[in-house]
Curated annotation (Swiss-Prot):
Gene giving rise to this polypeptide: ycf4
HAMAP family per record: Ycf4
Protein localization: Plastid, Chloroplast thylakoid membrane
Cystine crosslinks: none
Pfam families to which the protein is assigned, alphabetical: Ycf4
Function: Seems to be required for the assembly of the photosystem I complex.
Protein name (database record): Photosystem I assembly protein Ycf4
UniProt keywords, alphabetically: Chloroplast, Membrane, Photosynthesis, Plastid, Thylakoid, Transmembrane, Transmembrane helix
GO biological process, alphabetically ordered: photosynthesis
Family: Belongs to the Ycf4 family.
A GO cellular component entry from the record: photosystem I
Keyword Disulfide bond among UniProt keywords: no
């Protein structure tokens, strides 16, 4: 096997620093709201920095408890996506075997392993989608016969314009397919 006949790109998935950050922030905020709501119900300060006896339980304390529970659930969900490495995987392009393999981890269950394989001959082109603005979108797609387009880049933190162009051009040249800009 020649070292130039295989290209493999790892995809980070949910184990990004920003997901850890948001899980901690949302979880601690949720706990703060829940303790404040419970303190207003019990008329006893569970947190020494908050004077909950000044908060009426119905409706303020009840609403704060609800938001606290909701925040804790969101934090747990984010924590589980990090724990199970949801979205993590790789894109492998093997010219020697003539296959493209796209692998991702999902949530536990019957379909935890997402493993797609395609023939290189089924690939029509590599397409790059660029959208600027408040929420920029920079994605490389694998265009397969039958009008199917499979995203190859990670979700969340977009690559720089230079990185996306280099990766798409390198991939199109490696597969000897057309490069489309959209």
């Amino acid at each position: 096997m020649k070292p130039d006949s295989i290209r493999r790109y790892n995809v980070i998935g949910s184990r990004r620093i920003s997901n850890y950050w948001w899980a901690i922030i949302i979880g601690s905020g949720g706990l703060g709201f829940l303790f404040t709501g419970l303190s207003s119900y019990l008329q006893f300060n569970l947190l020494p920095i908050i004077h909950a006896e000044k908060i009426i339980f119905f409706p303020q304390g009840l609403v704060m408890s609800f938001y606290g529970i909701l925040g804790i659930f969101f934090s747990l969900y984010l924590g589980l996506t990090i724990l199970f490495s949801v979205g993590e995987g790789f894109n492998e392009f093997n010219k020697e075997l003539g296959i493209i393999r796209i692998f991702r981890w999902g949530f536990p269950g019957k379909n935890r392993r997402i493993d797609l394989s395609y023939s290189i001959d089924d690939v029509k082109a590599i397409r790059v989608e660029l959208k600027d603005g408040i929420n920029p979108k920079r994605t490389i797609y694998l265009c397969i016969k039958g009008q199917r387009q499979i995203p190859l880049t990670r979700v969340g933190q977009p690559l720089t314009l230079e990185e996306i162009e280099m990766q798409a051009a390198e991939l199109a040249q490696f597969l000897q397919k057309d490069l489309l800009l959209n």
